[in-house]
Structure formats: C-alpha cells, structure tokens
Swiss-Prot record:
Positions of region (Disordered): 114-174
Protein name: Single-stranded DNA-binding protein
A Gene Ontology cellular-component term: nucleoid
Domain SSB: 5-111
Species of provenance: Rhizobium meliloti (strain 1021)
Gene Ontology terms describing biological process: DNA recombination; DNA repair; DNA replication
Length: 174
C-alpha cells in the first residue's frame, strides 16, 4: 500500500488567457487560473447559492505547455489532473508568503479540453504532443516514442483510439 497520495482533479473554466513564460534554457512554463463552482439551494430561503473557488495551475510538462499555448483561452472548460505543491516566496517588503498551486509535470499530469477548440471535439492532454483520431486530440505520454526511449514525456506515436467500433471484431475469441 502506498504511503501517501497527492492528486488533484479539477473541472473548471479558465479565468484569463494563460501566461506562457520560458526558462533560461527555453523550456515553456504555463500559468493559468481555473474557476470551479458549486451551487446549492439555501434550506431556509430556497434561494440558489453559488460559491466559486479559484485555483492556480502551473504546467511544467513541455507537451502540455504546447497545448495550453496553442488552444487554451479564457473561458475554456478544462479537466485537469495534477499534484498540489506549496512554494515559499518573499513579497516586496521581505515577508515570507506561501502559494499552493496545482502542478502538472511528469507522467501523472493530464489536461483535457472539454469544450473543444473552435467547435471541434474536446482535446486531451497527457504529456506528449501528437494528434489522435476520433474527433479529438489525445496527447499520450505513456506510449513509447519511435526512438525507443521517452524524452521529456513526449510521444511520437499518435494514438489512433477514439473510434474503435470499426476495428471491433464481433467474433468471440474463445
């Protein structure tokens, strides 16, 4: 049994166009804010109530940064899987501050566009940067690249899933 689990799953809307920065060696880092809301009816008044939470998401995964940079805009609905990380920083007056963020890096991160891009089907992200079939895009870093080893979580093999019904054989294999 695992000693601990650090996994965050969010479905929400992007509050502003993502900010893309680059490290000194040119690798992209995407920052975005995701709003999640819950609604309920007040027991006493019957009035509909809503509470919105804002989440800071930081994407270090190079393949997912490309997806964010090209397709994610303000208002986009996203499904995100990542990890919580708290970082310490100092403000202008020298006081220590802490920020808790949802971080997407490595193999355990997912970013899926639920409302599509420009009216097409939803796009999915999972670390790599290749296109799949079936009316959606899937970026799957769990597949081996054509070079044999994975580099930076990128995949060179497109995932041809999504429309598997034409490949389905009706015969039972036993």
């Amino acid at each position: 049994m695992a000693g601990s689990v650090n996994k965050v799953i969010l479905i929400g809307n992007v509050g502003a166009d993502p900010e893309i920065r680059r490290t000194q060696d040119g690798r992209p880092i995407a920052n975005l804010r995701i709003a999640t809301s819950e609604t309920w009816r007040d027991r006493n008044s019957g009035e509909r109530r809503e509470k919105t939470e804002w989440h800071t998401v930081v994407v270090f995964n190079e393949g997912l940064c490309k997806v964010v940079e090209q397709y994610v805009k303000k208002g986009a609905k996203l499904y995100i899987e990542g990890q919580l990380q708290t970082r310490k920083w100092q403000d202008q007056t020298g006081n220590d501050r802490y920020s808790t963020e949802v971080v997407l890096q490595g193999f355990n991160s997912t970013l899926t566009m639920l409302d599509g891009r420009g009216g097409e089907g939803g796009g999915a992200g999972r670390g790599g940067s290749d296109y799949g079939g079936g009316g959606y895009e899937e970026y799957d870093q769990s597949r081996p690249s054509s070079g044999g080893a994975r580099s930076g979580g990128q995949s060179n093999q497109p995932n041809q899933g999504g429309n598997f019904s034409r490949d389905l054989d009706d015969d039972i294999p036993f």
